Swiss-Prot record:
Domain of life: Eukaryota
Organism of this sequence: Laccaria bicolor
UniProt free text on domains: Aquaporins contain two tandem repeats each containing three membrane-spanning domains and a pore-forming loop with the signature motif Asn-Pro-Ala (NPA).
Name of the protein this chain belongs to: Aquaporin-5
General function of this protein: Water channel required to facilitate the transport of water across membranes. Does not mediate the transport carbon dioxide across the membrane.
UniProt KW keywords: Membrane, Repeat, Transmembrane, Transmembrane helix, Transport
Motif NPA 1, residue numbers: 64-66
Cellular component annotations (GO), alphabetically ordered: plasma membrane
GO MF term (any one): glycerol channel activity
Catalytic activity field: H2O(in) = H2O(out)
Amino acid sequence: MAEFVGVALLVIFGAGAACQVILSTNPGVSPSERGSFLSINFGWAIGIATGAWVSTGMSEGHINPAITIGMATYRGFPWREVPGYIFGQVLGGFVGAALVYANYFHAIDIFEGGHRTQATASLFATFALPYMTQASCFFSEFLATAVLFIVFLALNDKHNGALTNGLLPFALFILFIGLGASLGMQTGYAVNPARDFGPRLFLAMAGYGKAVFNYRRQYWIWAPIIAPILGAQAGGLLYDTFIYNGDDSPIKWR
């Protein structure tokens, strides 16, 4: 339940900020534009911080399947709990998107003229810029998630100045501002399969149809799902190989 609420908050703040910024560019929605790409970065950063604050006391505070799988691989998180965590995370993404969509339903209708297209689907799920190749999309998500997991491991490393639960959300806030400002433009920096798949599933049911899944040869599975999972695995390998001094790592040869 904590992972569900954490991801729901993440999407409410992140997708909500995206809706306000993009939809307000239409004069029929708002008399003036309300924000910029930085506003969207802040929305996702506030979402990850509040999601972590709410969930850390009751769960591990992963609110990201890539983090959950990474922690199971490198820090002994029980594999038997992974499916339940991921289910809660994806459901949280679905519900968070549904709530934001309900809040901005009329604005979306005005912006789209009654139709449902990628222009507003991208407010909830990630879609790469047209010039990006398949390999470039994969690498962008892989790199961003590797960085995310390296920092996440460091923040929880007792041998490397681990933060208390109270400070962890603030550190994640700074991290997400940085990820958005440096690696967010080209693919929308999903770095979290639940934050993309949950809202994408909702979009398919809310009138956007199968186009959200058919986009760029099933982009939805290999860029915002597979790439983050593998990116977290690579980040964990690098951290445990070169930095980690604990005895609970599967990398024993150091």
